[in-house]
Amino acid sequence: MIRNSMKSHTELLSWNLLQKEADRVRLNSDSLTCVVPDSNNYESSKQINCIEYDYSRQRVNRTIIDLLIDLANEVKLQEKIDNLINGKKINISENRPALHTALRDLGNKSIMIDGLDIMSAVINTREKIKVISNQIREKKWLGHSGLPITDIVNIGIGGSDLGPRVCINALSNYISKEFNYHFISDVDPASFNDVIAKINPQTTLFIVSSKSFTTKETLLNARKAFALYEDTASIDQHFIAVTAHPERAYQMGIKTVLPIWDWVGGRFSFCSAVNLITAIAIGYEQFVELLAGAHDVDTHVQFTDFKNNIPVLMALIGIWNNNFLNIHNLLILTYSKKLEYFVPYVQQLDMESNGKSIDVNGSMVDYATGPIVWGGLGNQAQHSYFQLLCQGTHRCVGDFITLKTNDEHEINSMCHYKMKVLSEGIQTIENPYGYIPGNMPMNHLILSDCSPYTLGALVALYEHKIFVQSVIWNINPFDQPGIESAKSAHREITLSSES
């Protein structure tokens, strides 16, 4: 039974002051500019190494930013960030930490869980990733027939698929062209057959990733891949499992197993052995750069004051749009083909984490939580949903992501034009059908490049933004009870239909 809320966050002083500011903003909704006028000038652009964050087109001013930071302080955000990174059991429904940040901690500090230092296991696993990736890249990992590996197939779904897929696509300038990279995540036979038609099983390595090693889709595809080989002896050099339950992988017949741990959520496993295919593709040294980019954002979010803290500002401005301006969907547009899979990755990360209506006390919330996340390649939006953005009745918030490189000049120009039109509108046109109201709040993230370091930083930035918002909403971003409940119902229906 869901309990009534003890004290809602809507009763906080800062929340009520923000509501009054939102009422004032709505009275001035015809303003041509997204930024609310304010006598106190403030810097609306922040930088962390390889990423510049520009929120000058958001409907905020210094007063609103200060109140949002007051809200963060009222809910003890700094303490919650420290608890996350220091390994406190913040995943309260499962009574465990959420220590994905430990996976990319390249320092020498100890992180204790129930009296055990987990960093020794993390470092040991990194060493295994290094050895395996080097052996494959140096043609020393041979298949059963004695031939070197030419194709790597990643079998997984959700976080075990989307993160690696983002990397292989985004880091195309870094990956070895001596290998072919494939992904199977779907139970649709066509997906499996399309990949199998392109490979030689004798020179193929399958990476089977499943935290529980009970994921139906993943195990079905793994068994179909097993059937490509004559017997269990011939599969030893062709399969690697990544799981928190190695005994299940061994039982299935896979002898080489890399661990993931119950304190790492599947959708937060980007920096784990789940991304082994990326370490093989770009080499271990560049894989460490990926970890370093994420780790530097971890340090930034923990030790930077909130006024200059990019993930915190992104989260708080997102709260402002979602809970006070009542804009409940987030459009993410990436202006580089390399980032084609970034939007589905964030879509899962955000909506599975914060798509909750029950708070950490087991009470129904009385405010909006996670937004609907959608989007894709920005240059394709012109010919699909740009019309709705210009003149539709649904309001959106936008994250526009561009690369600051010479070969992206033309596509970046298209991005700037769209941001200008959507934020400022077109009001001085004689044809009334051409009227565009504008006033779309938006962020602009400018990446210095699309390197492993920058990609790691970008992923960590969104991870922390999502966590910060969960703190404000008082929900647990590290479980998925709705999914588990639906799975149980599906099993019951299946058993009932079979009886």
Swiss-Prot record:
- Where is it mainly found? cytoplasm
Subcellular location as annotated? Cytoplasm
* Pfam families linked to this entry: PGI
What EC number(s) would the UniProt record show?
5.3.1.9
**Cross-referenced InterPro entries:** G6P_Isomerase, Phosphoglucose_isomerase_CS, SIS_dom_sf, SIS_PGI_1, SIS_PGI_2
Q: Which Gene3D superfamilies match?
A: Glucose-6-phosphate isomerase like protein, domain 1
GO cellular component, as recorded: cytosol
**Pathway listed for it?**
Carbohydrate biosynthesis; gluconeogenesis; Carbohydrate degradation; glycolysis; D-glyceraldehyde 3-phosphate and glycerone phosphate from D-glucose: step 2/4
Q: Does the keyword Transit peptide apply?
A: no
One MF term from GO for this chain? glucose-6-phosphate isomerase activity
Gene Ontology biological process terms from the UniProt entry: gluconeogenesis; glucose 6-phosphate metabolic process; glycolytic process
Catalytic-site annotation from UniProt: E352 (proton donor), H383, K487
Q: Which UniProt keywords apply?
A: Cytoplasm, Gluconeogenesis, Glycolysis, Isomerase
> Which reaction does this chain catalyze?
alpha-D-glucose 6-phosphate = beta-D-fructose 6-phosphate
This molecule's function is given as:
Catalyzes the reversible isomerization of glucose-6-phosphate to fructose-6-phosphate.
Q: Which family does it belong to?
A: Belongs to the GPI family.
Protein's UniProt name: Glucose-6-phosphate isomerase
